From Swiss-Prot:
3-methyl-2-oxobutanoate binds at residues 42-43, 86, 116. Belongs to the PanB family. GO terms for biological process: pantothenate biosynthetic process. This is 3-methyl-2-oxobutanoate hydroxymethyltransferase. SUPFAM superfamilies: Phosphoenolpyruvate/pyruvate domain.
Amino acid sequence: MLPSDLVNYKKKSRKIIALTAWDSISGSIAEQANVDLVLVGDSLAMVCLGYQSTLPITLENIIYHTNAVSRGFKKKIEEQPLVVSDMPFMTYQCGEDKAVEYAGKIIQSTYAKAVKVEGAEPEIQKVISRLIRMGIPVMGHIGLTPQSYLNIGLRKQGESLASQEKIKKEASILEELGCFSIVLEHIPDLLAKEIQNSLTIPTIGIGAGNYCDGQVRVTADLLGLNDDQPPFCQPIIQGKKLFKDKLKEWVDSERLS
């Protein structure tokens, strides 16, 4: 799977499904579930490492976990899902040269075929343009951008007319820069629909309704493994309770044996 395949999926109106993964087990499960894309996201800071935000994740963390995820794949190379790695906080906000160096390390050192960059501010636009010119495919990410939570919080974006116009303009710019797809996070459904209809590249929604060309979810949220669920992700099972109850049953039975 290559980034260009996702663009072809949009042309064919084929829905794109993506999940996050953080180790070989979650990577293997995602592959066996037949997802199109596996995102090694900086959300692993909270899912795996116990942090309260995504900001502490380092470049070394992303490389380590991306390689772990890829080792879980068992299908032929051409049948494996596309792997996209997040660019951690301050690996692309620090200038074009450093961003190219850090993104290059991800692509060289892992099986990732693209990186994801949050935001579309003028400085970020320059970074994205440079990365793409250097041969590194980029997935954009607008709407709620968790790496900016210290400034904007974690609230829904695009609820005012000015915010909607800003997000629409950002989506158009990201396509012009050459992004192969864009994540739309926590924005109104109809705004996502308008953006989806205006672009030739696919939109991947998380908390952006069902009009997007695809959906991505944090696997731990979907499986109910976290105590705090985002408002836009309804778990399909209460995994934490299920695993806890089953493990407690085993512990109790072993103590009595």
